[in-house]
From Swiss-Prot:
Transmembrane domains' residue ranges: none
Organism, scientific name: Bacillus cereus (strain ATCC 14579 / DSM 31 / CCUG 7414 / JCM 2152 / NBRC 15305 / NCIMB 9373 / NCTC 2599 / NRRL B-3711)
Record's keyword annotation contains Cytoplasm: no
GO molecular function (one): small ribosomal subunit rRNA binding
Gene: rpsT
Protein name in the entry: Small ribosomal subunit protein bS20
Keywords: Ribonucleoprotein, Ribosomal protein, RNA-binding, rRNA-binding
Amino acid sequence: MANIKSAIKRAKLSEERRAHNASIKSDMRSAVKTVEALVTNNDLENAKEAFKTASKKLDKAARKGLIHQNAAARQKSRLAKQVNA
């Protein structure tokens, strides 16, 4: 553990940010899995609604720097192919 006051504060902030980022990533992954599950069950109406939600979460994660912008675009593209197939 750090001894200097500013280093202690930075370590605390880092841990808080890590937990927050993990939460956002988890929500994003859950949204993607929901879309994939709905597509496999041939529930296309609900899959389209879930796709909108997942798309927003992917974009937000990319904007915040949690995932790369191209990774978000790739995941959205693959999900869109599944939903529209």
